[in-house]
């Protein structure tokens, strides 16, 4: 995985928008402090400054390396996940990433060694070993993942040695995850560390037999049940899913993932690296897929059917597309021409663009918290027109963007929801806190319905237009 630091650039001139939408000077998309101006660009002037440490003193919504590792590994349903650090690091485990399970619920239970001051002085290795043995005795998990945090990393606890000792005592797989938060400013390193853990300690250790036309879904985390709709369509095509890495998965399924005939790469940051490594180590080919949006789903299913030579499946897929178009038409009639702002993960940012085109809507702004240069290049390629790109926006900067350009819809996560509402801008949850699946054709209908409800709710006609504290003037930005 590429963790290089630098700006993305693309000097290609994009055709103008079909809406009356003008963007100011490239360095004055919004008013902010000089060191942040490069993070807000017009796509015609290249991508924004990205993949850099946040400016000291600025509020950021980014997560840490440990946060990146845990969202990849914790959806493994029958494993125990022990956080070796202060109890605060183990927060929000019950509904981690919104991942649903049709199997065990053990992954939702949070375990922490709850390091305190005396452990910083005397070390926490004994406490960690005791915790591992206790969890194994009470819950008997298929495997135990142990996550290092900033505190345990600073005091020098050797979690690898403790895990080796615990593995000998329990007979279970006890797997260290060296995910100290201070290792990088970008949680993407945590994604890669988690992938390395799976490659080195899990994948390849299983011996289950798999049949013909078998695949792994790599980078699918079953948010709100997305995985189940993908599996339903693949099974109708005669394709079997060996393992989902990692949503609604088990340790045994992932351990046999190397036997699948094809890897389907769903989320670029979490899965591109692991798919490339599996091809090197096990010879498993991979193709990129995207099951969000009507056309993206169609293209993905056709690519899979071509790989396995399933000619009849292609006709069935095209029939599903026509049926979905008919059902989406009533939403498109009320959404045509509306403007959209996006602030999500890098992979989601570009995949949303075509989906909104299917609804007749136009993306005028797109940003990410941890985007890499390639993410912004893909956003520009998918858009084909000029738009505003921004990186790691803090709440004041975000409020300024929304106030200045007033999109008809803002798509982001729970942390940005109430900012949007306070500004009188309709909002759609797309990250981990949504409750409806958005994958494939049925999921796209759910998405269209949610967007229509948000944009065309009568409440916005009753609410007076609002600004947010003079857009941050009181913070000394002017």
From Swiss-Prot:
Source organism, top-level taxon: Archaea
Keywords of this entry: Nitrogen fixation
InterPro entries, A to Z: Nase/OxRdtase_comp1, Nase_comp1_CS, NifE, NifE-like
CDD domains noted in UniProt: Nitrogenase_NifE_I
Pathway linked to the protein: Cofactor biosynthesis; Fe-Mo cofactor biosynthesis
Gene Ontology biological-process annotations: nitrogen fixation; protein-containing complex assembly
GO molecular function ontology, one term from the record: nitrogenase activity
Function: This protein may play a role in the biosynthesis of the prosthetic group of nitrogenase (FeMo cofactor).
UniProt family annotation: Belongs to the NifD/NifK/NifE/NifN family.
PANTHER family registered for this protein in UniProt: NITROGENASE IRON-MOLYBDENUM COFACTOR BIOSYNTHESIS PROTEIN NIFE (PTHR42956:SF1)
NCBIfam families listed in its UniProt record: nifE (TIGR01283)
Protein name: Nitrogenase iron-molybdenum cofactor biosynthesis protein NifE
The organism of origin for this protein: Methanothermobacter thermautotrophicus (strain ATCC 29096 / DSM 1053 / JCM 10044 / NBRC 100330 / Delta H)
Gene that produces this protein: nifE
């Amino acid at each position: 995985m590429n963790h290089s630091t630098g700006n993305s650039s693309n000097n290609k001139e994009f055709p103008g928008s079909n809406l009356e939408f003008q963007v100011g000077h490239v360095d004055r998309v919004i008013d902010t402090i000089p060191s942040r101006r490069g993070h807000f660009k017009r796509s015609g002037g290249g991508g924004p400054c990205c993949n850099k440490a946040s400016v000291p003193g600025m509020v950021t919504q980014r997560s840490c390396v440990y946060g990146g590792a845990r969202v990849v590994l914790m959806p493994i349903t029958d494993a125990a996940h022990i956080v070796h650090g202060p109890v605060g690091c183990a927060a929000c485990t019950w509904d981690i990433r919104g991942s649903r399970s049709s199997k065990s619920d053990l992954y939702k239970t949070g375990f922490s060694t709850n390091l305190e001051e005396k452990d910083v002085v005397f070390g926490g290795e004994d406490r960690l070993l005791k915790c591992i043995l206790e969890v194994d005795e009470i819950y008997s998990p298929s495997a135990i993942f142990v996550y290092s945090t900033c505190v345990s990393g600073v005091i020098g606890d050797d979690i690898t040695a403790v895990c080796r000792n615990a593995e000998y005592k329990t007979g279970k797989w006890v797997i260290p995850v060296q995910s100290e938060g201070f290792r990088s400013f970008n949680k993407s390193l945590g994604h890669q560390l988690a992938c390395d853990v799976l490659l080195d300690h899990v994948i390849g250790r299983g011996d289950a037999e798999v049949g013909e036309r078998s695949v792994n879904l790599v980078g699918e985390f079953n948010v709100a049940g997305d995985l189940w709709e993908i599996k339903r369509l693949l099974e109708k095509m005669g394709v079997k899913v060996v393992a989902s890495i990692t949503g609604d998965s088990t340790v045994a399924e992932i351990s046999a993932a190397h036997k699948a005939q094809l890897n389907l790469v769903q989320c670029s940051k979490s899965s591109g690296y692991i798919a490339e490594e599996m091809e090197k180590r096990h010879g498993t080919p991979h193709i990129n897929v995207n099951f969000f949006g009507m056309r993206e789903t169609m293209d993905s299913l056709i690519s899979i059917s071509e790989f396995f030579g399933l000619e009849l499946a292609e006709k069935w897929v095209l029939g599903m597309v026509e049926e979905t178009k008919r059902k989406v038409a009533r939403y498109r009639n009320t959404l045509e021409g509306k403007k959209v702002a996006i602030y999500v993960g890098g992979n989601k940012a570009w995949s949303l663009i075509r989906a909104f085109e299917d609804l007749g809507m136009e993306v005028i702004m797109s940003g990410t918290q941890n985007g890499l240069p390639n993410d912004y290049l893909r956003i520009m390629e998918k858009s084909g027109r000029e738009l505003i790109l921004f990186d790691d926006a803090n709440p004041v900067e975000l409020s300024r963007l929304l106030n200045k350009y007033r999109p008809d819809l803002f798509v982001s996560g729970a942390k940005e929801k109430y900012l949007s509402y306070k500004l009188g801008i309709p909002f759609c949850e797309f990250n981990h806190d949504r409750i409806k699946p958005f994958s494939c054709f049925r999921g796209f209908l759910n998405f269209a319905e949610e967007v229509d409800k948000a944009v065309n709710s009568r409440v916005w006609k009753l609410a007076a237009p609002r600004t947010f504290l003079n857009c941050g003037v009181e913070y000394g930005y002017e």
